[in-house]
Amino acid sequence: MERLENCAQMFQRRFLNESFRRHCPVLLACIVLGGSLLKELCPLPDSYWNNKRNVLNVYFVKFSWGWTLWLLLPFIALTNYKLTRSTTKVLRRLSSLLVSTLIWYLCTNLFLYIENITGSCYESEAMSDPKEHQDRRECRLHSGYWHGFDISGHCFLLSYCILLILEETSIISNIRFERHWHRMAINAQFAALSILVIIWVWMFLCTAVYFHNIFQKVIGTAFGILAWYITYRWWYLQPISPGLPPASASRSGKEPIYRN
């Protein structure tokens, strides 16, 4: 258990610290711009990481929202309850995950709609021999290749998940442990979320240097950062909202939601 605590403390000091949280949106913007320029000006040779069958893409990125939701839900519930001792306030904070899920659903469907209305169906990736299929789904059902404006869903979702986890884990520095099982459970969840952030940042970098064009990646990343900003930097500061994590509320100058 001591190793688990040391691991959580190491992640808190070196990765999920205040400086990284504050500069992460700028870092993500730099990664997507720098990676896109590298792809255009000096493409990297094929590697394991631009193979869509790589293990992180197959088992993590394809289910990135599920992983993020699955790990954040118990973490938010335990940490917020420990600070507030209020089931109502915990449920209020958990409603932020419903908001985030709605944002994920609307944005991904918007991206698919844009790709659908801007695309055409072809026999192959060389875009030869147009086929008479009117939407992406029908085209692929008939073994065609749909070419449209494909906003990077990976850039959107990975950037959004990274910023979401950083906001919600900021609460860790406010917690004082009284029971051993509290420390063990919360440290294990924090360590798992820290590892998830590292995976998301790495795969975001791989997307930037290997896939899509610069406009598709920049727009996807902009949606992710904007979704975070509108919720955590504006709406969640308002009285009628899921509210911020207690640590974030204190930093923003608002009254923390766990105070009576």
Swiss-Prot record:
Keywords: Endoplasmic reticulum, Hydrolase, Lipid metabolism, Membrane, Transmembrane, Transmembrane helix
A biological process from GO: fatty-acyl-CoA catabolic process
Major localisation: endoplasmic reticulum
Top EC category: hydrolase
Keyword Transmembrane helix: yes
One Gene Ontology CC term in the entry: endoplasmic reticulum membrane
Membrane topology: Multi-pass membrane protein
Catalytic activity, reaction form: an acyl-CoA + H2O = an acyl-4'-phosphopantetheine + adenosine 3',5'-bisphosphate + 2 H(+)
GO MF, one annotated term: triglyceride binding
Subcellular localization, as worded in the UniProt entry: Endoplasmic reticulum membrane
Annotated EC: 3.6.1.-
Cytoplasmic side: 1-23, 79-93, 167-189, 232-260
Sequence ranges on the Lumenal membrane side: 45-57, 115-145
InterPro entries assigned: FIT, FITM1/2
Active site annotation, chain numbering: 154, 212
Transmembrane region(s): 24-44, 58-78, 94-114, 146-166, 190-210, 211-231
Purpose: Fatty acyl-coenzyme A (CoA) diphosphatase that hydrolyzes fatty acyl-CoA to yield acyl-4'-phosphopantetheine and adenosine 3',5'-bisphosphate. Preferentially hydrolyzes unsaturated long-chain acyl-CoA substrates in the endoplasmic reticulum (ER) lumen. This catalytic activity is required for maintaining ER structure and for lipid droplets (LDs) biogenesis, which are lipid storage organelles involved in maintaining lipid and energy homeostasis. May directly bind to diacylglycerol (DAGs) and triacylglycerol, which is also important for LD biogenesis.
Family designation: Belongs to the FIT family. FIT2 subfamily.
Record protein name field: Acyl-coenzyme A diphosphatase FITM2
Organism: Xenopus tropicalis
Organism ancestry: Eukaryota, Metazoa, Chordata, Craniata, Vertebrata
